[in-house]
């Protein structure tokens, strides 16, 4: 692969008629990192990805730079970016190898080099035995690997993912997420990955940019986003939270994660509560504990522990577990 580059966005924004899809923002994607754009539907993450790719233009005076080159006015075919879509965007009349080779053929890459690159990419995504298979004979996961191989074959400066795993079943999605993460680390290519799935974001991102209503609301490492969320929206969107203190005057409320609650079936902890329900999650269980607030809090416990509805408990928080936000 080519040497990794930095991607810099300066005062980029996008408005469609009277609707603001993306408020002005500055953002830098470091060379060789995977930056995940995370947020709910309609938050502006795909618009931002399309601006980076050249499929959309930023409203003036927004600029996009690849290292020291201003690519703002360049269309997608001049930016040398690779894109992987949710719907694969493969050609059904071409076989696996022909799909991977298509972009190289359009670029005028000589046949010998083209064949060598196709072989290299198919080996990279473990599809060599399927080189001559028809696209309609592939599974969803295999199709997404073909799409990834095709994007990488042109040796792009930047690799862009638009929710590539959203259409797959849960088990396949988990496996491909691991494979894509390992591949991105191995290639050390600059990548931007769009998703609404916080587990995907945590697993793949070197950093995560959380977006809300067209705004970038927090940019941090996965650990920073989860452990030090900048707002209640971020805390709520990335994992579960409990409200453990109400303040009707609008002062900061206190929250905690389900795994940060200490629980005992005796009186060792200062706070009291009652188990009102539980959900089995495989290796763990999620308990609902009534602590006298409007809603019960959630507590994460090992699945082998036995807790009964109606059981009285004591509880506390791990040190420095509480989060505070102004609401």
Labelled PLM ranges:
Residues 7, 22-24:
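Conserved structural motif at the start of ABC-family nucleotide-binding domains
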């Amino acid at each position: 692969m080519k040497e990794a580059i930095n991607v810099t966005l300066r005062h980029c924004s996008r408005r469609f008629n009277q609707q603001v899809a993306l408020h002005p923002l500055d953002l830098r994607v470091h060379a060789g990192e995977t930056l995940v754009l995370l947020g709910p539907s309609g938050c502006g993450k795909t618009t931002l990805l399309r601006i980076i790719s050249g499929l959309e233009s930023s409203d003036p005076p927004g600029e996009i730079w690849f290292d020291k080159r201003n690519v703002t006015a360049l269309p997608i075919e001049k930016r040398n970016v690779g894109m992987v879509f949710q719907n694969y965007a493969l050609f059904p009349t071409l076989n696996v190898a022909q799909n991977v080779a298509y972009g190289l053929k359009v670029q005028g890459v000589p046949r010998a080099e083209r064949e060598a690159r196709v072989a290299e990419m198919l080996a990279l995504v473990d599809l060599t035995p399927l080189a001559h298979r028809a696209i309609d004979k592939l599974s969803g996961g295999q199709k997404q690997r073909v799409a990834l191989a095709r994007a990488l074959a042109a040796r792009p400066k930047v690799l862009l993912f638009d929710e590539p795993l959203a259409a797959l079943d849960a088990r396949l999605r988990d496996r491909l997420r691991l494979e894509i993460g390992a591949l991105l680390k191995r290639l050390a290519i600059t990548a931007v990955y769009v998703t609404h799935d916080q587990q995907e974001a945590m697993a793949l991102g070197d950093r995560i940019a959380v977006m809300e209503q067209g705004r970038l609301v927090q940019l941090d490492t996965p650990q920073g986003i989860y452990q030090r969320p900048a707002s209640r929206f971020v805390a709520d969107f990335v994992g579960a939270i409990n409200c453990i203190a109400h303040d009707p005057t609008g002062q900061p409320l206190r929250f905690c994660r389900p795994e940060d609650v200490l629980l005992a079936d005796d009186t060792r902890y200062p706070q009291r509560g009652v188990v009102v329900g539980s959900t089995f999650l495989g290796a763990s269980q999620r308990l609902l504990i009534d602590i006298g607030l409007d809603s019960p809090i959630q507590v994460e416990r090992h699945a082998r522990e036995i807790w009964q509805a109606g059981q009285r408990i004591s509880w506390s928080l791990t040190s420095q577990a509480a989060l505070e936000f102004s609401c």
